[in-house]
Amino acid sequence: MILIEHILGNVKKDPVWQAKLKDATFDLLILDQREAQKSRCRKSSTQGLDLGISLDRHVVLADGDVLAWDEENNVAVVVQINLRDVMVIDLSELKSRSPDELIKTCFELGHALGNQHWKAVTKHNEVYVPLTVATSMMDSVMRTHGFQHLPFRFVKGAEILPQLSNSEARLLFGGAEDSDTHVHVDSPLDEPHGSGLHVHAIHSHGDGHSHSHSHDHDHDHRHDDHDHKH
């Protein structure tokens, strides 16, 4: 096993390493969302190198990090992180609103995101939400709930990761693929039993069973026979 205790550089951000590895062969260490949050793990590269990652606890691997460099054979071990895309909601424009408007908008946005069971992290006047459904569906949720005045965009998760602390990264990416998927897109003018769009994924419960459901009524569920956990 090859022990990796330090990151040499980043081929995507560091011009020196970009030039050095211009004609090099990349032996990729491919990490998924959960693995990317760990400062310690053991995994093989695409060319079969047995790598033991043992970094300082505050260090998080980033896409393009160079972990090893065999100059003689012109081969570099480089990290490739496969993260979900992220919706970035810019809250900066709320600074110009009245305190009442700011509080109301933030409360309603939090309620809308929570109603979809979407994970979120707020940082630098932005809200980061990992994609669990199609971007068109997330776009519809934002616009239907009246947040079209808040600029939002979709970016690669790897662009957001360096800005996050370990705990924030775990919250945003750790197990995002296991989140229950709820999409409710209703017009404010819809009747209680109107034709608004409802998409529900399967819910897993602690008692080992699961169920799926779709309906044309409001999102107000009562289950008397068991707790409804997410």
UniProtKB/Swiss-Prot annotation:
N-terminal signal peptide: none
GO biological process entries: protein folding
Subcellular location: Cytoplasm
GO CC annotations, alphabetized: cytoplasm
Chief site of localization: cytoplasm
Entries under CDD domains matching the protein: UreE
Compositionally biased tracts (Basic and acidic residues): 182-193, 204-230
UniProt-recorded Gene Ontology molecular function terms: nickel cation binding; unfolded protein binding
Pfam families tied to this protein: UreE_N
Region Disordered: start-end pairs: 182-230
Family: Belongs to the UreE family.
Database matches in NCBIfam families: PRK13262.1
Official protein name in the record: Urease accessory protein UreE
Gene source species: Yersinia mollaretii
Gene name, Swiss-Prot/TrEMBL: ureE
